């Protein structure tokens, strides 16, 4: 599976008053962060992360310091592991049971492929508390919080587009399109005004040698309800379904119609091109907000990609990662209490101050672009969707990473691209295509 590099935001956010208070752990004698929760005897546990120097690392360090201040008897030793082989190190440490009590864990199928050494948290933290965290089910067994939550989310992330308001105004576009038909009208106006509508390439994160197609695919597949995405996993809905091909045919028309750059396969400057005003739109995520605001100021806007025949009413809002407890941890009460502490308003404020979007229901941010993104599901009736590359088999993701890009560039037909994805799926054993999600 493609390893997403979680590039955190460089600006500070803030939590508004009135957040829901965290509940006490079901196995403790006090609220999270209180001395009565874990006793007063000296305890040392370790925490591994792969954040480097990102804002996620700042949030983690500040959470640890705040928790230790509440518990002078507790020492949490932070270990920053290399990102490129982080999960290999975790797996090796789990075999010898020499790893950490707490560890950064990615959500979706990343969690499920590692669940053999993760501790379910439902007996330590009340389900009512866990369910206050948006998207907590995506770090749970079978993506069902009732079946056992493994990960307490650290932050929320979005897949979204960015657009240049000044270029839209120059082309005479007064409102952002909401469906395929309106989008095609808009890109035609931009082209007529001599403006490149979209730029595609490696983007802000540089996840692959070409562009990352799953920002787009997530929105194209919103023609199905969230629950029906499981049919893509089981094969009940084939990737070669005519409805999916119809979506891809509309999508690739953006490139074949001349509404993108011509070098979509090898453009390494797409994000910089957008920031410098050379294109009206680009696909990214919330990790790009800070750079976009710095470069374009009030001229930058965020949008929900309107890759739908009907007005789009879904948004990718997903807890990209968080912390889990290993099942071989020798001080589970302390580790669980730290995770419970992460659900409290005080901890969520620390997360926000580091420039991340907290996952607690009712939280918000002072940044206007993030506020707009949060408002779609919170206030406008949009349905929250996961990142599709986190909930379909990694082998299919790997195939799609090349075939979808080739189809967009016009070097492969959409039918062939989807057939290769379907062939990859059907080659997997039945256990990997069952009604129960598994990581491997």
PLM features: residue spans?
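Mature extracytoplasmic/periplasmic domains
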Residues: 120, 271-272, 276, 287-291, ...
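Extracytoplasmic "Venus flytrap"/periplasmic binding protein-like
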Residues: 66-134, 169-178, 281, 291, ...
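Hinge/lid segment of periplasmic solute-binding proteins
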Residues: 107-159, 184, 212-213, 243, ...
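Extracytoplasmic/periplasmic solute-binding protein
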Residues: 146-154, 159, 184-236
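A structural signal for short loop-to-beta-strand junctions that line the ligand-binding cleft
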Residues: 93, 100-101, 128-167, 312-315, ...
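Conserved C-terminal helix/tail region of periplasmic/extracytoplasmic solute-binding proteins
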Residues: 169, 256, 382-440
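Extracytoplasmic/periplasmic substrate-binding proteins
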Residues: 50, 110, 249-331
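Glycine-centered hinge/linker elements that transmit conformational signals in sensory
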Residues: 187-189, 232-263
């Amino acid at each position: 599976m493609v390893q997403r590099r979680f590039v955190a935001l460089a600006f500070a956010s803030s939590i508004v008053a009135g957040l829901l208070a965290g509940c006490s752990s079901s196995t403790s004698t006090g609220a999270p962060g209180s001395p009565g929760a874990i006793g007063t005897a000296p305890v040392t546990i370790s925490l591994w992360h792969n954040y480097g120097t990102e804002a996620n690392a700042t949030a983690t360090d500040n959470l640890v310091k705040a928790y230790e201040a509440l518990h002078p008897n507790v020492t949490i030793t932070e270990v920053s592991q290399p990102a490129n082989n982080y999960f290999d190190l975790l797996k090796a440490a789990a075999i010898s049971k020499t790893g950490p009590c707490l560890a950064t864990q990615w959500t979706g199928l990343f969690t499920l492929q590692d669940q053999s050494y993760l501790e379910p948290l439902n007996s330590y933290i009340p389900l009512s508390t866990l369910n206050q965290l948006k998207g907590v089910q995506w770090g749970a067994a079978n993506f069902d919080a009732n079946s056992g939550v493994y990960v307490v989310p650290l932050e929320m992330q979005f897949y979204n587009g960015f657009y240049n308001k000044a270029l839209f105004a120059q082309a005479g576009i007064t409102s952002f399109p909401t469906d395929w038909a309106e989008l095609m009208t808009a890109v035609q106006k931009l082209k007529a005004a001599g403006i490149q509508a979209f730029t595609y390439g490696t983007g802000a994160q540089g996840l692959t040698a070409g562009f990352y197609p799953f920002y787009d695919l997530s929105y194209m597949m919103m023609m199905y309800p969230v629950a029906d995405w499981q049919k893509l996993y089981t094969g009940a809905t084939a990737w070669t379904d005519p409805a999916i091909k119809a979506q891809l045919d509309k999508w690739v028309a953006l490139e074949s119609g001349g509404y993108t750059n011509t070098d979509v396969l090898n453009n390494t400057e797409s994000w910089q091109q957008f920031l410098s005003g050379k294109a009206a739109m680009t696909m990214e995520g919330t990790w790009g907000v800070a750079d976009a605001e710095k470069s374009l100021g009030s001229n930058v806007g965020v949008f929900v990609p309107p890759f739908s025949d009907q007005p789009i009413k879904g948004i990718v809002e997903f807890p990209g990662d968080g912390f889990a407890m290993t099942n071989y941890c020798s001080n589970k009460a302390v580790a669980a209490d730290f995770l419970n502490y992460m659900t409290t308003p005080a901890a969520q404020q620390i997360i926000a101050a580091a420039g991340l979007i907290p996952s607690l229901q009712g939280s918000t941010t002072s940044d206007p672009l993030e506020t707009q993104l949060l408002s779609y599901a919170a206030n406008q009736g949009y349905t929250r969707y996961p990142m599709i590359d986190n909930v379909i088999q990694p082998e299919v993701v790997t195939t799609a990473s090349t075939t979808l890009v080739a189809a967009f560039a016009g070097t492969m037909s959409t039918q062939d691209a989807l057939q290769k994805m379907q062939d990859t799926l059907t080659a997997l054993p039945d256990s990997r295509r069952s009604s129960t999600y598994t990581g491997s």
